[in-house]
Amino acid sequence: GYSPVIDYNLEYTSVKSLKHRLVEQFSLAELAGKYINILWDDGSHKYNVKSFLGEIDEILKGIRFSGFDQEMLDSVIGSLRERGNSNATINRKMAALSKLLRKAHKMGDVYSLPEFVRQKERAGRIRFLEYEEEKRLFAAVRSRCEDSYRLSIFLVDSGCRLGEAIGLTWNDIQEHRVTFWLTKSNRSRTVPLTKRARKSTEIAHERLKGPFSMLNQVRFRQIWNDAKIEVGLGTDDQVVPHILRHTCASRLVRGGIDIRRVQMWLGHQTLQMTMRYAHLATHDLDSCVKVLEIR
């Protein structure tokens, strides 16, 4: 049968399409190179963003584009799913992608953006250490490395993030309080220290920048993983160093500290993040009944 030859290279003269044709084409890696330092501060979060965007560029096979359409977005999400990414992980990666594309759009590098829809995240069970588990795990850490033991104590009693603790300087510890400056949300916070957290920072300064500056994340995680296997927690994926932050939060909530103060202690930007621990406050509604009982 007759099939017409379709000329896809028609030139439209509307102002809109003229504008489109003037837009240069960029790959995602090029856009990241252009804007990453403007959009994200230095730190571990920026490092993660860099690898997220690198992975997405690789999924897109480094193609250059002047508009990012829904189909491209769907193919990225589909590929991340095939790679075993959970919805929560996909949302983190999409947040980075959308922030970069919005900036590129604002600067006139990309003329169209897809609609980003958050994937539904399951409220994952928050695993924390019971005192007995902490004791066994910390003893195994200590038998391998005294510095890592001190750091473990500090993490579980201050609830700070691993990077925040390793980045501490001596100046950040004043009169039984510690100030975290290098935080994920770029807001400093100051928390008082428990006796054993204080003790964990009391070592000879020598040439060290801070109490845990002789350690790095890779080395600490290695020691942690060996200790974890030794005490029979090897198959529990959730027993990572970050569990110490969850453990601190859950102890505060179970001890009757109100959720707003727990938020301030942990340095969460939104209360919603802290609400993940709220259900642990088993008896915090009992006082409501007292108020309502007719005297």
Language-model features, listed with the residues they occupy:
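N-terminal DNA-binding module of tyrosine recombinases/phage integrases
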Residues: 1-71
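Catalytic-site neighborhood detector that most strongly recognizes the C-terminal catalytic loop/helix
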Residues: 26, 128, 182-186, 196, ...
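DNA breakage-rejoining catalytic core of tyrosine-based enzymes
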Residues: 66, 108-111, 121-139, 185-195, ...
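Basic, Lys/Arg- and aromatic-enriched nucleic-acid-binding interface segment
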Residues: 91, 107-162, 166, 295
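C-terminal catalytic core of tyrosine-transesterase DNA break-rejoin enzymes
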Residues: 106, 153, 157, 161-164, ...
